[in-house]
Design a protein with these regions (language model features):
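Glycine- and acidic
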Residues: 1-7, 71-78, 210-214, 271-276, ...
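Hydrophobic anchor at the start of a short beta-strand
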Residues: 105, 133-134, 212, 238
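Generic secondary-structure signature for well-ordered alpha-helical cores
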Residues: 3, 7, 24-28, 52, ...
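N-terminal amphipathic, basic-rich helices that act as targeting or association modules
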Residues: 1-48, 204-228, 234-242
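Long, well-ordered, tryptophan-enriched scaffold segments
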Residues: 140-289
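A short alpha/beta connector and helix-capping loop motif
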Residues: 116-138, 152-161, 253
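Cofactor-binding active-site loop characterized by glycine-rich and histidine/acidic residues
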Residues: 8-129, 282-295
Length: 295
């Protein structure tokens, strides 16, 4: 349908598996999934009962190219501007906590949107409030940090495990009960931070006070499902860094992701944009009317 009416192709092709993995562990419309900017929400729309209406995408009275609350209860937030998604997710998380709910809250934000100050303001808020929220960084361009082999993967699994987190909490509580224990806890934390600095690529987020996991393959559904399941169980702010490829599955879009980011109607075989139908723009109509009135 994107080839017929135009739209955001490369970004959506790059997040198909990611969206499917989130849907596998979330329950809609009870759970809340927010797409920062929102132009990568096509798969979400198809999976939430709008498949048959997809041919109306970006048409008058048809499906919007972005999430819309008045279009479906599964769209939690009307996005369109960048860097606002984490703030919205934090708001949903706090509202859930205050009302005694148990719904899952997640936000998908691109690496480009992390250039906006509002995103970091929200991350700082999440770290302070300690509310359960999963922030998925869809990294399809900027290298936030490279995986350090199998050891990094092993550390990710340990830090998401219940046994590790329960033991960590118990040891901290015991040590903080005495003056000597507090000194020991301080030394242990310093040692842990030094180790993480070397092995954990998202140390910046860890310094904020948010658990970081990744990078993981954004096209490996099983790995993402397992990671998301563990993350939601921990009930605290967690950043999951996934690496994706814009335009995944369509050769032209993979090779020219910027060109196919937002594209006019095109031929799927050749990848070339179709000649636009000649229509009069507002300026043309205005000029003709003024000439006619002056005659």
């Amino acid at each position: 349908q994107v080839s017929v009416h135009g739209g955001h192709l490369a970004s959506n092709l790059g997040t198909v598996e990611l969206t499917m993995a989130l849907h596998a562990v979330m329950n809609f419309p009870e759970d809340k999934l927010i797409f920062d900017v929102g132009h990568q929400s096509y798969t979400h729309k198809i999976l939430t009962g709008r498949k048959d209406a997809f041919e109306t995408l970006r048409q008058y009275d048809g499906l919007s190219g972005f999430p819309k609350r008045n279009e479906s209860p599964c769209d939690a937030f009307d996005t369109g501007h960048s860097s606002t998604g984490i703030s919205a997710a934090m708001g949903y998380s706090i509202a859930r906590d205050l009302s005694g709910g148990d719904e899952k809250v997640a936000v998908v934000i691109g690496d480009g949107s992390l250039t906006g100050g509002m995103a970091y303001e929200a991350l700082n808020g999440l770290a302070q409030l300690k509310t359960g929220c999963v922030v998925v960084i869809n990294d399809n361009n900027m290298s936030i940090g490279k995986n350090v082999g199998g050891l990094s993967k092993y550390l990710n699994e340990i830090r998401l495990g219940n046994a590790y987190n329960e033991l960590k909490t118990g040891v901290e509580s015991s040590l903080m009960g005495s003056k000597t224990g507090k000194k020991i806890a301080k030394v242990l934390k310093r040692s842990k931070d030094n180790i993480k600095q070397f092995f954990v690529p998202g140390m910046f987020f860890e310094e904020l006070g948010i658990t970081y996991v990744g990078p993981i393959d954004g096209h490996d559904i099983n790995q993402m499902i397992t990671t998301f399941q563990h993350a939601f169980r921990l009930d605290k702010p967690i950043i999951i860094h996934v690496k994706t490829k814009k335009g995944k599955g369509y050769g032209y879009a993979e090779r020219h992701p910027d060109y196919f980011h937002g594209i006019a109607p095109f031929d799927r075989i050749s990848g070339k944009v179709l000649a636009a139908k000649k229509t009069s723009c507002y300026t043309d109509i205005f000029a003709k009317k003024m000439v006619k009135l002056g005659e």
